């Protein structure tokens, strides 16, 4: 399988998806036709989200079609060279994909060789479940099971920063809560600016920041770019 799982879409001082373009270009390998799944977008229309994505990827010669705009979305996915899943609200994303019967077709086409690109919520969707999202559950997706393209859980936008005077939990504390009730999980705290690529049977960590892996009953393990999972 070929996957590009990004923690986020924007970095300070850079345009939207600018940091991701070289990574996408490296994994295209001749693929030029993409379907875009915009369902995580809540405060922007799916048309606008698709147009925004298409404009950025045009520089790589990739044509983008919004899955919401086609007559037969399942067929569009089955014939896709690239499946792109944008960030936003993960619960809304999973709900829409489940209701439209898209989860199994996405899994199948990626296993057959399509490239999967997802950022933030799109990276969450590639995991076994969406239980490590940071998002508010604004809708009920009728279960948390997701695509299971990547075998570990990703927590995008990972940071342990706590504003002075703030009494809420840190991100690690919330992850530890999940590991109490689901100790079988391995959770990757993927900070902004980092990504995971899957290619030729290997999953490799990229990006300038330290990533952390959490397991029940163990200290967090710091990982740097180049680590293979």
Swiss-Prot record:
GO terms for cellular component: cytoplasm. The keyword Cytoplasm applies. The active site is at residues 120, 135, 157. Keywords: Cytoplasm, Dipeptidase, Hydrolase, Protease, Serine protease. Its main location: cytoplasm. It comes from the Bacteria. InterPro entries: Class_I_gatase-like (IPR029062), Peptidase_S51 (IPR005320), Peptidase_S51_dipeptidase-E (IPR023172). Hydrolyzes dipeptides containing N-terminal aspartate residues. May play a role in allowing the cell to use peptide aspartate to spare carbon otherwise required for the synthesis of the aspartate family of amino acids. PANTHER family: ALPHA-ASPARTYL DIPEPTIDASE, PROTEASE S51 ALPHA-ASPARTYL DIPEPTIDASE. This is Peptidase E. The lineage of its organism: Bacteria, Pseudomonadati, Pseudomonadota, Gammaproteobacteria, Enterobacterales.
């Amino acid at each position: 399988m070929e996957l590009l799982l990004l923690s986020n879409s924007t970095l300070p001082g850079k345009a939207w998806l600018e940091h991701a373009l070289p990574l996408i270009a490296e994994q295209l390998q001749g693929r030029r036709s993409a379907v875009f799944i915009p369902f995580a977008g809540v405060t922007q229309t799916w048309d606008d989200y698709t147009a925004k994505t298409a404009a950025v990827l045009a520089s790589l010669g990739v044509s983008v079609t919004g899955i919401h705009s086609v007559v037969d979305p399942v067929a569009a996915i089955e014939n896709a060279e690239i499946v792109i899943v944008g960030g936003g609200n993960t619960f809304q994303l999973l709900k829409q994909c489940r209701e439209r019967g898209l989860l199994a077709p996405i899994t199948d086409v990626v296993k057959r060789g399509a490239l999967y690109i997802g950022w933030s919520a799109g990276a969450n969707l590639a995991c076994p479940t969406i239980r490590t999202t940071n998002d508010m559950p604004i809708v009920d997706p009728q279960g948390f099971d997701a695509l299971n393209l990547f075998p570990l859980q990703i927590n995008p936008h990972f940071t342990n920063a706590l504003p002075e005077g703030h009494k809420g939990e840190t991100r690690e504390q919330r992850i530890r809560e999940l590991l109490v009730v689901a100790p079988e999980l391995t959770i990757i705290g993927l900070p902004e600016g980092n990504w995971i690529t899957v290619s030729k049977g290997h999953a490799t960590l990229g990006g300038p920041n330290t990533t952390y892996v959490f397991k029940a009953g163990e200290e967090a393990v710091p990982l740097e770019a180049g680590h293979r999972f």
